[in-house]
Regions:
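Bacterial Sec-dependent N-terminal signal peptides
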Residues: 1-4, 22-75
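Ser/Thr/Pro/Gly-rich low-complexity, intrinsically disordered segments
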Residues: 8, 19-23, 82
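ATP-dependent phospho-/nucleotidyl transfer catalytic cores
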Residues: 563
Length: 826
């Protein structure tokens, strides 16, 4: 392709498209240019993402005029080109200096909110929820589903594909001896990842693997050496935290197979079975090579052998799979541990394509998804389409200013926030409900993977602004699931319809109430409210004590109190006065566990006595708390900061304590007993300074956290990504505002990292088209707000209301190197 044509292909057009002859106005006769474009609209700005040129006569040149670059950022790069999928892609505990590891993201390919995540997997066992860690030296295969940034042993990693040559291995093998299995060492220098594309060279087989994705499927291209016995093999039993317990595969025609993989708690998975994940993945696959030499391997296990993680990683399990029986050319097979392979000769550099669609509903659903998204065979076109989807999604926020690394961190963070909650429907609108029956709807997209304890804090407040329809979908998914499964309550950590019970609290309530208060109401409000009230009543404080005794009593009392307050706020908005009074009173539960003698929150027993105070005092991790200590958890009274300050001894004392909390924090922000940005309980704390009349400290510390806790590197996330939460915090804080208390419409203001942040508003939920945050005098050491204007008028508040944002307009900050202790003080 000539240079000008390749340039045209990637230009983003914001105005009319003009096509004319280079001698326009002089030539005689007809000159033809056929220009075909796929158009999509971003806030009424036309974007051309793919241009096919067919020049019918020599001497004809197509030139396009453009008015705006709507999917390009500073420097002419597409927004998707700023994404670095390796940020956070490690589970390494030594790097993290804690057992919880670092980001735990995956480096493979996904589309925004897509059902599939096509990614390399380096490990099956351990606390490696994404199935991948960068420092691992071998790859087991490439799966079609993954979880992003989670702990607790993970799940998915289904349909593990591996291109191989030579003898057939039915077991994955061990990392220390990869030659004894189908896994392979790989060339780290060859490993490449970007939005829409992943590639690596498997050195044991001299095969180059390339991956891309569609919303319901994945495309893999393998480049082989010359070999009489090249192969694609698929471990149908594989699962990140265990195994599927039953599988089925059948040959459809000379190029296609289909089947399913049944995953239950008996096979480990989410929480090693404790998360109660129970699902079936259906697949439909077409190969570019005919199925001539193919077969299925089937392993049998000793009677009584379990199928959970400890069994799957045992020598006995490995030996049973190594001895698997191989059946050649079966029409179909079903069993407890199956794998499929197809073999073929290849010449040097020969490429073999494999296209797969999945469904959680049925075989027919998988085939329908395939026909809708995977008809073509052009691998590059699939890559470009995936990148184009990310260009569109990432253009919800456009930034200028900052360094190249900061822009990469920003757009990678935004990318990570748009993986979940993923679409759980087929293209037909069908999905499996909480009653295990198939339902169909076009009213909303059924969504799944809700890491509630994490994402109510920043992730969903962010999506309320930039993707309110996704939030509306999620709320409909909450409501229908609670109705379908007959519980009438919301789950705190939902995974593929499973109520896993992971963590604590009632975060779905906060998500729904925050959305309702911000005008997102496309669901049955009365039913949603009824389920919220039932959730708070059934899953919360001890009904007679009014607090949670023992165990994780500090975390439970504080968090359940906040969620009760959320119900009270919603009741008040719905004119349910009696309910409002009840739940607002329950929101004061924090007062019942504050020990005046210790000056802090303390575990209280059921008889009203205090539990023993630990030797480390409020720095004792797990004392009454979930994944934190009382010093960290104790700041969580976001709905009544003034009441919290009162019982803690007043503003001056609290402010001094809060400053000490941050000053004792290690600057790399890895797991620590003070401001532990590596975990969620403290994510609101930097914004407390605004409420304490010291907004310049919010400005200072958010800038420090953005600079030191986030990096354009493998260790660029100081803690688990947690399904978008860690990244969403960065997006909001670096843009200059973040909520302290979801359920309120107030956002706390701080100093933006970037010179300009432009947020595209959804006109279905907003009056304005865009909200822009701009800065003057911005620099790495100029983090203090000197003054501000909102739509040209002086603005002296350290907060802004949601209504001011969705109305559209511009918030302008003048920044300086010294604090202005008069601006924004309440």
């Amino acid at each position: 392709m000539p240079y000008w044509a390749s340039t045209l292909k990637n230009i983003d057009f914001g105005a009319n498209l003009f096509v004319f002859d280079e001698n326009f106005g002089q030539r005689q006769g007809f000159l033809f240019v056929l220009l075909y474009a796929e158009l999509y609209y971003l806030n009424i700005i036309q974007n051309i993402m793919e241009i096919k040129l067919n020049l019918k006569q020599a001497g004809v040149l197509a030139i396009a005029a453009m008015a705006a670059l709507s999917v390009q950022a500073r420097g002419g790069k597409r927004l998707s080109e700023y994404v670095n999928p390796f940020i956070g892609a490690t589970t390494n505990t030594q790097m993290a200096k804690a057992e919880h590891g670092l980001g735990k993201t995956f480096p493979g390919v996904a589309t925004p909110w897509g059902m599939t995540q096509v990614s390399p997997n380096t490990i099956t066992g351990g606390d490696n929820g994404s199935g991948y860690s960068y420092e691992h030296t071998t790859i087991e295969g490439f799966a079609l589903t993954q979880m992003s940034g989670i702990g607790w042993y993970g799940d998915l990693g289904n349909y593990l594909v591996m291109p191989t040559t030579g003898p057939l291995h039915t077991y994955r093998g061990e990392a220390e001896r990869p030659e004894e299995g189908y896994r392979s060492r790989y060339d780290k220098e060859s490993e490449t990842a970007r939005a829409g594309y992943y590639a690596v060279r498997l050195t044991d087989y001299d095969i180059r693997a390339e991956l891309t994705a569609t919303p319901h499927g994945g495309v893999m291209r393998f480049t082989y050496p010359e070999n009489e016995c090249s192969r694609i093999q698929i471990d149908l039993a594989r699962r990140v935290g265990g195994t599927s317990v039953r599988q089925y595969v059948e040959r459809v025609d000379d190029y296609a197979i289909r089947g399913w993989m049944r995953c239950t708690p008996d096979g480990g998975g989410w929480g090693n079975g404790g998360g109660k994940a129970d699902y079936t993945v259906y697949f439909y696959t077409r190969f570019s090579k005919p199925l001539e030499r193919y077969g299925v391997w089937s392993a049998e296990f000793p009677e009584g052998m379990g199928r959970k993680l400890e069994n799957v990683t045992s020598p006995e399990f490995a030996e049973a799979v190594r001895r698997a029986k191989v059946t050649e050319r079966p029409d179909r097979m079903e069993g407890d541990h199956l794998g499929f392979y197809t073999e073929f000769p290849t010449c040097e550099g020969e490429q073999v394509l494999m296209r797969t669609a999945i469904s959680f509903v049925s075989l027919e659903g998988a085939e329908a998804n395939f026909k809708a998204e995977l008809k073509g065979k052009d691998f590059e076109r699939y890559c470009e389409k995936a990148a184009a989807l990310w260009d569109e999604a990432l253009s919800k926020i456009k930034i200028s200013g900052g360094t190249e690394d900061e822009r990469t961190i920003f757009y990678t963070s935004l990318y990570h926030t748009m993986i979940d909650p993923r679409d759980y429907r087929d293209v037909t609108g069908e999905y499996v409900g909480g009653d295990r029956k198939v339902h169909k709807t076009d009213a909303f997209k059924k969504r799944t993977v809700f890491s509630g304890w994490d994402v109510f804090r920043s992730q969903f407040p962010l999506q309320n602004l930039i993707n309110p329809e996704v939030v509306n979908d999620m709320i409909n998914s909450f409501v229908t699931l609670a109705e379908e499964n007959g519980t009438g309550v919301y789950e705190r950590w939902e995974f593929l319809n499973a109520y896993s019970g992971c963590m604590l609290g009632n975060p779905a309530i906060a998500v729904i109430v925050d959305a309702y208060m911000k005008g997102i109401r496309g669901y049955d409000v009365e039913k949603a409210y009824r389920f919220a009230r039932q959730t708070a009543d059934r899953i919360g404080h001890h009904p007679e004590l009014g607090y949670s005794p023992g165990g994780s009593g500090i975390s439970e009392t504080l968090e359940y109190g906040y969620f009760d307050w959320c119900v009270g706020e919603w009741a008040e908005a719905l004119d349910k006065t009696e309910d409002a009074g009840i739940y607002h009173r329950r929101g004061q539960a924090y007062r019942k566990i504050f020990d005046k003698e210790k000056g802090w929150f303390r575990v209280r027993n059921a008889d009203g006595s205090w539990a023993d105070w630990p030797e480390k005092g409020r720095l004792q991790e797990w004392y009454g708390c979930m994944e934190c200590n009382p010093y960290q958890q104790g700041w969580f009274v976001p709905h009544d900061v003034s009441g919290m300050v009162e019982i803690m001894g007043g503003r001056d004392k609290v402010l001094a304590d809060l400053e000490s909390f941050f000053e004792n924090t290690p600057r790399e922000f890895y797991w620590n007993p003070y401001y532990n940005h590596a975990n969620e309980p403290v994510h609101h704390v930097p914004f407390l300074f605004n409420r304490l009349g010291a907004p310049w400290l919010t400005q200072y510390w958010t800038r420090v956290i953005c600079a030191d806790a986030y990096k354009n590197s493998l260790a660029g996330l100081c803690g688990n990504e947690d399904v978008g939460q860690m990244s969403a915090w960065y997006i909001l804080a670096s843009a200059g505002f973040h909520p302290l208390c979801p359920g309120e419409t107030r956002y706390e203001l701080t100093a933006p990292v970037f010179d300009r942040v432009e947020i595209a508003l959804d006109r279905r939920y907003a009056k304005g088209r865009k909200f822009v945050v701009t800065t003057e005098g911005n620099a790495p050491d100029a983090c203090y707000i000197q003054s501000a204007t909102l739509n040209g008028k002086p603005y002296n508040r350290c907060y802004i209301d949601h209504e001011d944002i969705v109305r559209g307009g511009e918030l302008h900050f003048v920044l300086g190197r010294t604090p202005n202790k008069q601006w924004g003080v309440e």
